[in-house]
From Swiss-Prot:
Superkingdom assignment: Archaea
First-tier enzyme category under EC: hydrolase
GO BP annotation list: nonfunctional rRNA decay; nuclear-transcribed mRNA catabolic process, no-go decay; nuclear-transcribed mRNA catabolic process, non-stop decay; ribosome disassembly; RNA surveillance
Main location: cytoplasm
SUPFAM superfamilies (alphabetical): Dom34/Pelota N-terminal domain-like, L30e-like, Translational machinery components
Gene Ontology cellular component list: cytoplasm
Name the UniProt record assigns to this protein: Protein pelota homolog
Cofactor(s) needed for function: a divalent metal cation
Pfam hit, one: eRF1_3
Record localization: Cytoplasm
Keyword Cytoplasm: yes
Annotated family: Belongs to the eukaryotic release factor 1 family. Pelota subfamily.
Keyword match DNA-binding: no
Length: 350
């Protein structure tokens, strides 16, 4: 994400950004909220007297509109964020319009009060653009999966299969060649690659990779996993391979924190989950790290709950706040625990 303008007076004002990746569109879903004013260039029908006589001739013109946000929808597979609401600035004031925000779109977001997590998201998205991207190749004999590590989770790019019963050297090399060919088309120049899987197939593939695409292969490392597919991708994250490449990776951090939380809960230790228990622990000054699901945060704000007051109290008590993605496994687990939990400085009873 690229910030093109920042004009804040205290916590009020405008920040203009350009979405550079699909991850940025996902971030914007949780930065923009109902009631915000959003400006962007868009296309809208320009009616005239002659147009009404010949409706088939009505053309859309490019205009800059400001809409008051009522609804947001992130369409991952269409690579766009749809922002819907009434027009307050520009042509056809009072009419409803939908802004389709795509990669490369510049938008201005105006808020009466920017919240800490929203400003942090923008900072994280800016920094993420400067960090290496990570691609995971999970491979075993005759089967391979390629996945991209995104902020919202793992995006499965492709599955490659070699027909069973055909493991001759020539056919095996053809299988490896297909994997390399897909990586050539899909992987950015600055990306790092984790080659994972059970057995020795991954080492054999890395050798072939080095022989055929040495520059790209120089950014690859191997990691043992018990399986391939999505479970293999998650295993790579748990084992820390992605963390070694992207030490600030949101996904790796959330996986680690969730493991800590589950371990503490299983031992009846320094953990709290559910709004009531977390608030009780906060009253004792025990909250060291607050874990909250992005959907819980968004829904709480829409319902007018005191969710931001809780976050502020955690920060005032020198605690940390981590917002989890519910599109990723740790966030799903957190959501099932009530959407909010905390790792504590000390155990709280009662």
């Amino acid at each position: 994400m690229r910030v093109t303008n920042r004009s804040l007076k205290g916590r009020e004002g405008e920040i203009a950004v350009t979405a550079e990746t699909l991850d940025d569109l996902w971030h914007l879903k949780y930065i923009i909220e109902k009631g915000d004013m959003v400006f962007a260039l868009t296309r809208r029908k320009a009616d005239s007297a002659s147009d009404k006589l010949r409706p088939e001739k009505v053309e859309k013109v490019k205009v800059r509109l400001g809409i008051r946000v009522e609804e947001l929808e992130f369409h991952k597979f269409a690579n766009r964020l749809r922002i819907h609401g009434p027009i307050e600035h520009g042509m056809d004031t009072g009419s409803y319009h939908t802004l389709n925000v795509e990669i490369g779109t510049n938008i201005s977001i105006i808020k009466e009060h920017w919240k800490n997590d929203q400003l942090q998201r923008i900072q994280d998205a800016e920094e993420a653009g400067k960090r290496p991207k990570v691609v995971i190749v999970a491979v075993e004999e005759g089967d391979a999966d390629i996945g991209f590590v995104r902020h919202y989770g793992i995006e499965v790019y492709s599955h490659i299969r070699q027909s069973s019963g055909k493991r001759e050297t020539g056919l095996r090399n053809e299988f490896f060649r297909e994997i390399v060919e897909q990586l050539r088309h899909a992987v950015p120049e600055d990306a790092s690659i984790v080659i994972a899987g059970p057995g020795f197939t991954k080492e054999d593939f890395l050798k072939y990779f080095n022989e055929t695409e040495s520059e790209m292969a120089s950014k690859a490392l191997t990691e043992d996993t018990s399986m391939i597919g999505m479970s293999g991708f998650q295993e790579v994250l748990r084992r820390g391979a992605v963390d070694r490449i992207m030490q600030e990776s949101r996904i790796a951090r959330e996986s680690s924190l969730m493991e800590d939380l589950i371990r503490e809960i299983s031992m009846d230790g320094k953990a709290a989950y559910g709004f009531a228990d977390v608030k009780n622990a906060l009253g004792y000054g025990a909250v060291e790290t607050l874990l909250i699901a992005d959907e819980t945060l968004r829904e709480g704000r829409e319902k007018g709950e005191d969710i931001d007051k809780l976050l502020m109290e955690v920060e005032q008590a020198q605690g940390k706040v981590v917002v989890f993605s519910t599109a990723f496994e740790p966030g799903e687990k957190l959501h099932k625990l009530g959407g909010i939990a905390a790792l504590l400085r000390f155990k709280v009873t009662g």
